Amino acid sequence: MATIRELRDRIRSVNSTKKITKAQELIATSRITKAQGRVAAAAPYAEEIQRVLERLASASSLDHPMLREREGGKRAAVLVVTSDRGMAGGYNHNVLKKAAELEKLLAESGYEVVRYVTGKKGVDYYKFRAEDVAGAWTGFSQDPDWAATHNVRRHLIDGFTASSEGEAAWREGLNLSEGQDIQGFDQVHVVYTEFISMLTQNPVVHQLLPVEPVIEDEIFEKGEDLLSSSGDVEPDYEFEPDADTLLEALLPQYVSRRLFSIFLEAAAAESASRRNAMKSATDNASELVKDLSRVANQARQAQITQEITEIVGGAGALADSGESD
């Protein structure tokens, strides 16, 4: 059984750890509020560009490379969004597990998977397992901004535009030297953690490209030569220049903004997951301190009882010795 000194040392150690986890919990809570505010601030632009694209789609041929599912596609890009820091519970484990399931499904469908990663934890995970990563970007998982995410957003769009038959431009973060051939791809999937509430965050897969066009909740289906509407939708606007030209200009912006929104949502989910993990750790530390204090008190009581017994026994022995004299 541990001595009283050892128990008290453990109590001090646990209390010290508890202070750290409590501080991390409070920091994560404040970051959630900031992240939610950024997601909310980005929503009006996203809704407006979505509305404009719906109107453009209703007036255009929808014959755009970003809207077409490529028959005989060979390569699929998978972007795995992880965190730069740990102490976030199952945040990274869950998204990496989801990514592995997606990669297996794509491989079974005949695609060559090209993996990209954001977040130091994901980079370290694949490096430890000696698994290939075509590109990695770190340093912005908790507080993504437009400039920091530029290279990953542009590369995924450029790579899809080039297709598996073409080549994309080199960008910082790719695990290739400048000047080497960078083959494109035919699909782009993003695996990230969706923020649902302070207590719930789920890993999800989002197909970023090709974009599935939706006009007022009517999904467009591919015809013989191009995509055609499943319902009759009349355009409400006259476009200058024509709708196809505007769609050509706006679709890359829409995809880029959609990916940035994913980074913002993942940041909120990361902070929420870290807050939950730190709260659980703080609560567990409190319970452990209670248990250790109880054991220490019991040990102290036993020690005092033993000392009293020894004193009483010694006094009795001295009394008996005096009477015999």
UniProtKB/Swiss-Prot annotation:
Q: State one molecular function term (GO).
A: proton-transporting ATP synthase activity, rotational mechanism
Q: Name one GO biological process term.
A: proton motive force-driven plasma membrane ATP synthesis
Q: Which domain of life is it from?
A: Bacteria
Record-linked SUPFAM superfamilies: ATP synthase (F1-ATPase), gamma subunit (SSF52943)
What CDD domains does the record point to? F1-ATPase_gamma
- Tell me which UniProt keywords the record has, alphabetically: ATP synthesis, Cell membrane, CF(1), Hydrogen ion transport, Ion transport, Membrane, Transport
Which PROSITE patterns does the record associate with it?
Answer: ATPASE_GAMMA
Subcellular locations according to the entry: Cell membrane
| Major subcellular site | membrane
What family does this chain come from, according to its entry? Answer: Belongs to the ATPase gamma chain family.
Function of the molecule: Produces ATP from ADP in the presence of a proton gradient across the membrane. The gamma chain is believed to be important in regulating ATPase activity and the flow of protons through the CF(0) complex.
Q: What HAMAP family does this protein map onto?
A: ATP_synth_gamma_bact (MF_00815)
According to UniProt, the name of this protein is ATP synthase gamma chain
- Protein's organism: Corynebacterium glutamicum (strain R)
Gene name on record?
A: atpG
